[in-house]
Amino acid sequence: MAIQHRDPRGGGGSRDARTNRRIKAREVRVIGAEGEQLGVLPIDQALARAQELGMDLVEVSPMAKPPVCKIMDYGRFKYLEKKKQNEAKKKQVVVQLKEVKLRPRTEEHDYDTKIKKVRAFLGEANKARITVMFRGREMSHRELGQKVLQRVIEDLRDVAVIESAPRMEGRQMFMILAPNPKMLQSQRDKAKAAAAAAPAAAPAAGAPAPTPAPAPAAPAPAPAAADPAAQR
C-alpha cells in the first residue's frame, strides 16, 4: 500500500504538503480520489480510506478548520506537477544578447552582412549590442563611430528600438538595440492568422472523395441507308 511504503518524513523537503502520518490534525475534511466530498472524518478513518485505494492522504488546505485533505496518488501528482513546470520552462522566451562589431570605416559588404544578421536576431525577439572598435589615431575621430551607429539605427528602425544609447567604454563605442514591439506584435498576428487559416484550407479528415460525374453515353449509331440496288 502507498501509506505503508512511504517515508513518514515525506522526503520531499519543507515545501511538500503533509501526507499520511505526517498530518497532525485529529479530524480532517476529506475529498475523495474522484473529487467527491466524504465529509469530516477522524484522521485514522481518513487514512484507512486512502489505504484501501492504495493511495495517499494529502493535506491540501492546512489552514482550514478542520484541515482539508484529499485522497490521491501523491507520487504521480508530484511527477505531473514537475512535468508541467518543465513544459512551462520550455515555452519561456530566453532573450539573448548578440554582439556585432564594426569599425569606423567598415566596408560596405561587411556592413550589409552584419546588419542582416542583426535584423534576423532581432526578429527572434533577442537583443543586439552594436560595437564600434577604435584603433590608434581613430580615437581622435569619435564622430565616425557616431555616424556608424546612427546609420545602424536608421537601417533597423522598422525592427529595433534603442534600449541603451551610444556611449564610450574604453576604446569602444556601443549601443544596445531591442526588438521593436510593433514588429513582434505583427509577427504574432501573422502567426495567429496563419494558424487559423490552416484548418480551413486543409480538407476535412476522413471526408469521402467526391464521386466523379458519369461520362455521357455515346450516341447510338445511325441506321445504315438502304442499298438502291438491293431494292430493285
UniProtKB/Swiss-Prot annotation:
Keywords, ordered alphabetically: Cytoplasm, Initiation factor, Protein biosynthesis
Keyword Cytoplasm: yes
Lineage: superkingdom: Bacteria
Pfam families per record: IF3_C, IF3_N
GO BP, sorted A to Z: ribosome disassembly
Subcellular locations according to the entry: Cytoplasm
GO cellular component, as recorded: cytosol; membrane
Function, in words: IF-3 binds to the 30S ribosomal subunit and shifts the equilibrium between 70S ribosomes and their 50S and 30S subunits in favor of the free subunits, thus enhancing the availability of 30S subunits on which protein synthesis initiation begins.
Assembly with partners or alone: Monomer.
Family assignment from sequence similarity: Belongs to the IF-3 family.
Protein's name in the database: Translation initiation factor IF-3
Organism, scientific name: Anaeromyxobacter sp. (strain K)
Name of the coding gene: infC
